[in-house]
């Protein structure tokens, strides 16, 4: 009696019935391919490979120009391959620069689940010609296919990539709707997983380990999302990729690299190496735990970017909710239009966040702190060769330097900055420093320096900040440019000189400064070698029995000193100054 369509779908074809032998000695390539071809020809959908070790010729039936293409087990469309948990597909040792254990090319509706697929990298003969890297030996090669699922498979020891997902066929035919779930992929010489020409790929719940170890070949990434273009022509482009809830460890270089993909989401992963948005566009890196392996020296950055792609106008990267610890630099931001928010960065050496050759950068609501006393070093935020950077609502603690900027159009607003040696240092470019709570609070690792300093050729607006528990200048300016110091609250100064400004032109307006120092000498505002500055409407209080020097400008020229309220203090001005309307109590 003829089988009905539902019965046909339920039929499971046993590969051993076609001569496949799981003894680890017999070449079963032809037998498994014959089984797959017969299954498809009969309208069945499922092939079963039982427990055993099946030897496969990964170069069989290959394209001489690309020996991985069409090679090994060639999987037709509308087929599901089920393997026992103890099944092993083992590639025979060879000397080819390319091969494949499973090839899925130009077909649709394929599923491979269970078992192990093992390469021959340790038995391989690495001939010097024609391609000496031998980086094209693949566990599963997917080219121009669609609706493919790889699940619960262990893949290891390939000369190239464990899995590669790319375009194929005539013209440009990307692979579409590919899922790799709950797999273990390890010890590939090149990348454990490469994603090149595709649209809609999901990698979820996998363990990705030890890519590029030993005699590995570049780039040695856990997961590499990388297309290819020349000039204005794009030959391969990865788009709509999700890398979610995976564990990545021991990969020689990046754990995950989006070199130039578009619309990539990297979320919920646990990694001991770098996650990179590269030159990619519209990358989201969210809610990952990235903790450096202390035994690894090759990867020094938790999350990084490389810049804007040659054919793109912006990066449009979002970095949010990640926990990053133990790296030299926590986050290295490059490119244009990057938003970093809600990240926790711990135990870095050089910089918590670095913005380098970056523009339109928003860094908000992050917690940057060194917890271990011997690692309380480095800079929480470093801005170099960058512009249009906003740093707001962040918390910084236990660092040598809180913020160092040489950028232009920098906004440093509403941050809480505590326990540091040097606070905010603007040494080039221009910045607005507004609404911050700044308290060195007895930082122990190195001596305390300035809370806010503006030096060299920089200019700054320092407005509505609160300074407390400091032992060195809360504000120090030695720039030749213009600064505005407006509406700040400087509490209980213990210093001989509280505000020290030399050279340049300064507007010191509406600040409140209280002196906590019990004895003389004391100067609250000292303006030195400046000209055409203004000291207006400030409130200056001393708690000493004797009057202190509230304002000293006798080594500057043409200063306006107007409308200040001075409690237990006096003004020492220069003969060229205008002194008017001040109240001395």
What are these regions (language model features)?
Residues 33-42, 55-80, 90-113, 122-147, ...:
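Extracellular beta-strand-rich solenoid/capping regions of secreted or surface-exposed proteins
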Residues 15-50:
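Acidic Gly/Asp/Thr-rich repetitive segments characteristic of extracellular carbohydrate-active
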Residues 549-585:
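Leucine-rich solenoid repeat scaffolds
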Residues 58-59, 91-100, 121-127, 138, ...:
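Short glycine/acidic-rich loop motifs that flank beta-strands on beta-rich extracellular proteins
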Residues 48, 55, 74, 82, ...:
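Extracellular beta-strand solenoid repeats
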Residues 95, 99, 107-227:
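Right-handed parallel beta-helix
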């Amino acid at each position: 009696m003829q089988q009905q369509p539902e019965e046909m779908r339920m039929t499971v074809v046993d590969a051993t019935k076609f001569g496949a032998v799981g003894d680890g000695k017999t070449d079963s390539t032809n037998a498994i391919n014959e089984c797959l071809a017969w299954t498809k020809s009969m309208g069945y959908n499922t092939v079963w490979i039982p427990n055993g070790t099946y030897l496969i010729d990964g170069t069989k039936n290959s394209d001489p120009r690309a020996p991985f293409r069409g090679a090994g087990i060639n999987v037709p469309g509308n087929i599901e391959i089920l393997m026992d948990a103890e099944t092993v597909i083992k590639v025979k040792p060879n000397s080819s620069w390319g091969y494949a254990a499973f090839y899925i090319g130009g077909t649709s509706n394929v599923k491979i689940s269970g078992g192990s697929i093992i390469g021959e990298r340790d038995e391989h003969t690495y001939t010097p010609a024609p391609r000496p890297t031998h980086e094209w030996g693949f566990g599963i090669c997917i080219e121009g296919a669609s609706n493919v699922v790889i699940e619960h498979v262990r893949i290891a020891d390939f000369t190239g990539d464990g899995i590669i997902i790319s375009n194929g066929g005539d013209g440009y035919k990307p692979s579409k709707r590919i899922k790799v779930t709950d797999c273990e992929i390890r010890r590939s010489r090149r990348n454990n997983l490469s994603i090149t020409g595709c649209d809609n790929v999901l990698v979820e719940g996998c363990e990705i380990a030890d890519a590029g170890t030993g005699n590995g070949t570049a780039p040695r990434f856990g997961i590499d999302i990388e297309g290819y273009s020349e000039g204005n022509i794009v030959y391969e482009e990865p788009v709509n990729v999700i890398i979610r809830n995976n564990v990545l460890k021991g990969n020689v270089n990046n754990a995950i690299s989006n070199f130039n993909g578009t619309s990539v989401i990297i979320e919920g992963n646990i990694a001991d190496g770098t996650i990179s948005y590269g030159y990619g566009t519209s990358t989201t890196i969210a809610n990952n735990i990235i903790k450096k392996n202390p035994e690894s020296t090759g990867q020094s950055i938790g999350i990084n970017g490389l810049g804007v792609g040659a054919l793109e106008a912006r990066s449009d990267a979002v970095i949010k909710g990640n926990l990053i610890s133990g790296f030299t630099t926590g986050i290295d931001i490059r490119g244009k239009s990057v938003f970093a928010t809600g990240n926790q960065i711990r135990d870095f050496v050089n910089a918590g966040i670095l913005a380098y050759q970056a523009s339109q950068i928003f860094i908000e609501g992050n917690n940057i702190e060194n917890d271990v006393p011997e690692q309380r070093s480095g800079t929480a935020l470093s801005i170099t060769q960058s512009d249009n950077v906003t740093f707001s609502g962040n918390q910084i603690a236990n660092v040598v330097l809180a913020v160092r900027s040489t950028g232009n159009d920098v906004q440093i607003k509403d941050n809480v900055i505590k326990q540091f040696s040097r606070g905010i240092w603007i040494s080039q470019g221009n910045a607005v420093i507004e609404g911050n709570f700044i308290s060195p609070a007895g930082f122990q690792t190195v001596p305390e320096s300035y809370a806010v300093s503006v030096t060299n050729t920089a200019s700054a607006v320092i407005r509505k900040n609160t300074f407390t528990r400091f032992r060195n200048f809360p504000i120090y300016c030695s720039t030749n440019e213009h600064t505005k110091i407006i509406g700040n609250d400087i509490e209980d100064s213990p210093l001989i000189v509280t505000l020290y400004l030399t050279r340049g032109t300064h507007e010191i307006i509406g600040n409140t400064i209280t002196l906590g120092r019990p004895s003389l000498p004391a100067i609250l505002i000292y303006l030195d070698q400046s000209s055409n500055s203004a000291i207006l409407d400030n409130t200056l209080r001393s708690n000493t029995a004797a009057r202190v020097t509230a304002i000293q400008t006798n080594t500057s020229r043409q200063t306006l000193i107007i409308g200040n309220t001075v409690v237990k203090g006096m003004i020492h001005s220069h003969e060229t100054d205008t002194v008017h309307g001040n109240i001395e109590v």
